[in-house]
Amino acid sequence: MTSPGPQPAEPVRLAVWSGPRNISTALMRSWENRADTVVVDEPLYAHYLQATGLDHPGRDEVIAAGETDWRRVVATLVGPVPAGVRVFYQKHMAHHLLPGMDRAWVSRLTNVLLIRDPREVVASYVRARATVTVEDTGLPQQVELHREVAPPVLDAADVLRRPEPHLRALCDHAGVDFTARMLAWAPGPRDSDGVWGRYWYEAVWRSTGFAEYRPHRPELTGAAAEVAEECLPLYHRLHQTRVQLVS
């Protein structure tokens, strides 16, 4: 009797937990450009909108197009993937993890946190939606995830300054080889984009790679300034644990 040959490696379910107005969609583009990867774009968004009643751009479209039962969503996130797929890349918004949702499934994923200075996040967010809260930034939920599963933390500014080294580090974390295909992609929308893309993805649709980082401190006033200020301690807590490359 012949012995069985080597078994295919278990697919990597790489979950990147971001907040809004970050480079999360660009990072999804980067991974989708790999030949061995499939991606999913904010799979918990429809549940989040239905459960919270929040009025986001394209709310009705998102709910109609998505799955509103988070348990069914989770079943797909931890379930089988198509043959030949090495990486199942999951782009998540951390604030889509609502109170009362069982998070045990998160530990079955290979997790990463993607953070950005909340002053930049808030300034960008209020251009698309008039109001913003601390919860909307995803930072409270990212802090919870950091406490619960201790994932590595990437800061968007660091990634934009040195995309390739940070992508290599992320590939190492996922246990896959880096490929230069991750550094550039064709412009325009993709079938994998959520239906909300036309409200939020204009910059990504124009892009062909990671943008050059340009530091800036937006001038915020009123409630937006207060939200950003309240978020800063949460951001700093995560920022001090971020991946720092030595070379």
Model-derived regions: residue spans:
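Soluble or luminal CAZymes and related metallo-dependent hydrolases
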Residues: 65-73, 93-94, 134-141, 223-230
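A basic- and aromatic-enriched beta-loop-alpha substructure that forms the phosphate/nucleotide-
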Residues: 59-115
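Generic structural signal for helix capping and beta-alpha/helix-loop junctions
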Residues: 47-49, 121, 188
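PAPS-dependent sulfotransferase catalytic core
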Residues: 1-83
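Aromatic-acidic/polar surface patches that form glycan- and anion
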Residues: 16, 20, 135, 159, ...
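PAPS-dependent sulfotransferase catalytic domain
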Residues: 90-181, 198-206
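A structural motif corresponding to the C-terminal end of an alpha-helix
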Residues: 83, 145-151, 234-237, 241
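PAPS-dependent sulfotransferases, especially Golgi type II membrane carbohydrate sulfotransferases
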Residues: 1-14, 179-247
